[in-house]
Curated annotation (Swiss-Prot):
Expressed specifically in tapetal cells. SUPFAM superfamilies: NAD(P)-binding Rossmann-fold domains (SSF51735). It comes from the Eukaryota. NADP(+) binds at residues 14-38, 160. The lineage of its organism: Eukaryota, Viridiplantae, Streptophyta, Embryophyta, Tracheophyta. GO terms for molecular function: identical protein binding; oxidoreductase activity. The active site is at 156 (proton acceptor). This is Short-chain dehydrogenase reductase ATA1.
Amino acid sequence: MANSDKRLFEKVAIITGGARGIGAATARLFTENGAYVIVADILENEGILVAESIGGCYVHCDVSKEADVEAAVELAMRRKGRLDVMFNNAGMSLNEGSIMGMDVDMVNKLVSVNVNGVLHGIKHAAKAMIKGGRGGSIICTSSSSGLMGGLGGHAYTLSKGAINGVVRTTACELGSHGIRVNSISPHGVPTDILVNAYRKFLNHDKLNVAEVTDIIAEKGSLLTGRAGTVEDVAQAALFLASQESSGFITGHNLVVDGGYTSATSTMRFIYN
């Protein structure tokens, strides 16, 4: 690919949760499109491997700790003198059950990662981008769980709904600086979080990625026979990161769900 065709040529990006899954796929795609990528994660060995494979760098980052996120942004500024894209992708889930048995301490831990981690990322990326004077793109990983009930545990759903809200408010504040803030809501992408959830829901501890993919392909989208992939989400992130592709899009939640949250496939017979 010629440099002129690379949608993120000479851009600098930080991806939290970049060591595997959606984050790692996005790190590779951003690099292919000309970006220098900093992989920020608590998974050191996996993070280093991803960073080395793409010619980027790894930084240990627990997003629940504001100082870690600030240090990742400072690393970008020291190494490259700029930050163009912040992908707040790190997240976690819980082995949840009934609201009546909720462990509030565990909920607080989840919120510290899924919500506070996003707030930390937006805060420090915005500071760097405003200082740079070039604007930028901030992207946050949400979930279809933040859009409708029955797709995730109570605390997980709470956290993803919160992300959608803060994306809208920060887009409102930061737009005057040329900073776009958007979210992505994946559904039916067999990441570790989703596979573990299916194991619990189906009471099948040995359920593997291929089996979960088959279940999603059959029942989890309007595109029968097609499950989501981490590459699908990475392409959505690339779209939102690129000024040429999405320069007039902010405060938006891009849903990558095969149409699942738009309609019910169980009623398809009415169109026959």
